[in-house]
Structures are given as structure tokens and as C-alpha cells.
Amino acid sequence: MARKMLNDGEPDLKKGEEQGKVYDFDLFIIGAGSGGVRAARFSSNFGAKVGICELPFHPISSETIGGVGGTCVIRGCVPKKILVYGASYGGELQDARNFGWELNENVDFNWKKLLQKKTDEINRLNGIYKRLLSNAGVKLFEGEGKIASPNEVEVTQLDGTKLSYSAKHILIATGSRAQRPNIPGQELGITSDEALSLEEFPKRAVILGGGYIAVEFASIWRGMGSSVNLVFRKELPLRGFDDEMRAVVARNLEGRGINLHPRTNLAQLIKTEDGIKVITDHGEELIADVVLFATGRSPNSKRLNLEKVGVEFDKAGAIVVDEYSRTNIPSIWAVGDVTNRLNLTPVALMEASLFAKTVFGGQASKPDYNDIPYAVFCIPPLSVVGLSEEQAVEQTKGDVLIFTSTFNPMKNTISGRQEKTVMKLVVDAQTDKVLGASMCGPDAPEIVQGIAIAIKCGATKAQFDSTVGIHPSSAEEFVTMRSETRRVTGGVKPKTNL
């Protein structure tokens, strides 16, 4: 958990409710992203009368622009994955030559065509999400929602008309927004919102950040032929992931032609005739067509009227909730990125589902944040579940066993691509329980999703070893790693500043 929550207890659902009062809605939700839509549908299925509001649709968000489907569908996971697919074909076409495919003519990449296909898809999904709400009997309002009181929401429509609705429960699911660094010339840079909708393909890109968004866009643009410089403050990208796997990702990025600038920050951006001059804190100068800021996200909570109502939030603007997603105001709840617990779409879906189950389904249910799988859709991708080696060493009292496998995928032996797949298991030496798994290589997210089930169920290394593998496949390596790579003493904090 990234932040301290309110003390929890079995929620008293009558608390905060005015006895005998008739409300317009049992539940009113502010924000129709992944979490909001899931909470609306599930609550309605439990018999609740539900209203939900969302800002007008546009691919690029602002304080007054959003869209049903939220960040993931409109300007996040989905369009990004489409671009990752598009970028992957460049390497695939090159690799195809040794498999007998003769590419006699130049293969041109059409950015505008891909962009239009991406836009068509998010428009389609936006429509699907609206239909899901309608089919569930949820009333959708387009406009900006604010909390007027513990049981009242005000919705400002496009024409300025203000609508007011009472609700027994209010759920905040407004998500988060990309941050910008406070440096001279920052207005010349863009965030991931704009990066997904650029009218012209950037031939030269500078990316600030070492997180998954930065790494993914570096892979996307490089895969499409751009010159990419990735600037980040640590020694390795992807802080918080397993250090060994971070090094693998860094090696792969460099192997595909991305220029890495570790322990570096941006000092200034200057507009020139040739593009944008980027000056680093080391005095190095780079020229770019696009500068992408991938420096984190902040909760969308500023315009909700939280202070007036008395809803508690932290310095970053994240709404503080208990283990049932309830705020300090009994009738007001919050899920997803706006709470800054674990900012992933599947986590928001989990929180929303359990909120509905708690409030309207008669079963008080807490989200479980243990053993949640992650994926970084760089090329090739990284996927992990459970504890990293560093986390296991710090949290485990006894020794920790590390099993690794590094190999050249069968496909690469023919294509000639020099890029190893790396897989890793972290095991508690005393209990034999598999604490974590990592993989960097083709299809890693698809493979690790299956491994996540085993780890969630508490599988041991012996059970992994007794499982018959699928041959030939990369996945079978997870059940054939017999010899430990190293044994590490647990209960100590690893010395790492990577």
C-alpha cells in the first residue's frame, strides 16, 4: 500500500443516512471511467437506483474534458496498446526475412492511418461503455460533478445549467491526470494524452521519466522509426521493479537503438527553428520534435468541493479512504486513481466491484492488494507478479532462493535478433512458497497472467516443478528451472539506489 488509510471496521451503512428521507438516487457516481462504470453496473445489478456523471468526450483531457470510459479506454491502456502493436510490426517485418519472406520494396509507415484506426476504436469503446450503463438502467449525465453536501451532487452541464441530485451514497471515481515538471519552457512539452493524438509523427523525441509510460512510449516511437532519447533520474528505469529485470529492460531498450540518459534531468526547453532545444542538468543539448513528460500522475480531486464538505485528502490531493473505500464522511466513498492506492485499471475494477458488494450486496468486502500482476508494454514487454528479489529479501526472515533462466527464444535463432528472454522466480527457502515471478520477453504479460493464479493460490516451487510444460514454448521455462541461481539471506534491507 502506497499510503496510510483511515482506520477500518465493519461499515455501518446506515451511518450518514437521514432516516425517512427519500433520495433521488441510492448511489450517485462522479466519474465514468473503469471504476465508475463498474461500480454503477454492479450496484444497479444489486437493485440500486444509480446516477453517474462524466465530462464531455475528447481524446485529450483537461479539467473540463473527459469521456465515458475514462483514461484507460480513451487516453491510456487501450490506445497505447494499439500503438505498441503498430510499433511491433517494424521489427517483425525485419525478422520475417530469415523466415522466407522477401520484402523487395520499401515498407512505409503511415502514422495518420494508425492514428485514425486508434481513434475509431476508442470511439467504438466509448459507445459500448455508454450502452453498458444504459442496459444496466444507470442514468448518465454529461457535465462536471461536484459534491454540494454529504448527500447531494451538483452537475454543471455544457450550457452552464446546474442540476442538483440527492443520493444516499456518493462515489468519487474521477481518476488522475498527467503531471508536468516545473522547468523553464515546460509549455513546449506534452503529456501522454497528447502523445496518443499527435497529428504529425515525431522523427526526434526526448522523453523525461523512467516509469512504465516513459519506457513504453520510447519503445513505441523507436519501433516506428523515431530517434529517441530517454532521460531519467535513477541509474535504471522502472524504479520499484526487480533490479535485475530493470537492467534487462534497459539493455533491451539500448539494443533497439534508444539512447538512455540515466541520473539526468531536464533543466530547460527552448523553441528554435530546428525544433525544441532540450538542455539537461548536465549541460547536454538535444534537439527534438517532441518532448514528452512522463513524470507521474496526480489525483483528479481539485474541483470536487472536498474541503467545503469536509472530505479528507492528502497533500497530493488523493482522497483518504478506509479498507472498504469509505471516506471520513460516511455517505461518501472513493475508488481508483483518485485514492492513489494502487493505480491500475484492474485494481480500480476490483475496488469498484467490492464497493458495490459492500454497500448494496450485503457482503462487506475489502480489496486484496497482494500478488497483483503488472505489465510494462515496452518491446519486448516486462511482466511481474508478487515480490521482487529486493522485496523478498527485506520481508522474509529466512533465506530467499533465486531461480533464473536466460535464453535465446526459438524465433530469434532463425531471425537473428540478438535479444535474450529472461525469467525469474523468487522462492522462500523455508516454506518453498513461490513469492514472485518476473519475465521480460515476447508474450510476457500473457504468460505471467497464468503464473499469477498459481502464486495467488500459494503454489510452491515443488508444485511448479511437478507441472508438465508446453513444448516448445518460453512459458515452460517457469516449470523447468531446477537449479537455484543464488541464495540470499533474508531479513535485511538490500543496498540499492538504482
Curated annotation (Swiss-Prot):
GO molecular function: flavin adenine dinucleotide binding; glutathione-disulfide reductase (NADPH) activity; NADP binding
InterPro entries linked: FAD/NAD-bd_sf (IPR036188), FAD/NAD-binding_dom (IPR023753), FAD/NAD-linked_Rdtase_dimer_sf (IPR016156), GSHR (IPR006324), GSHR/TRXR-like (IPR046952), Pyr_nuc-diS_OxRdtase (IPR001100), Pyr_nucl-diS_OxRdtase_dimer (IPR004099), Pyr_OxRdtase_I_AS (IPR012999)
Alphabetically ordered keywords of this record: Cytoplasm, Disulfide bond, FAD, Flavoprotein, NADP, Oxidoreductase, Redox-active center
Family matches, as PROSITE patterns: PYRIDINE_REDOX_1
UniProt keyword Flavoprotein, yes or no: yes
Residues that bind FAD: S34, G35, E54, T71, C72, K80, G145, D337, T345, H471
A UniProt-annotated Pfam family: Pyr_redox_dim
UniProt-annotated location(s): Cytoplasm
Protein known as: Glutathione reductase, cytosolic
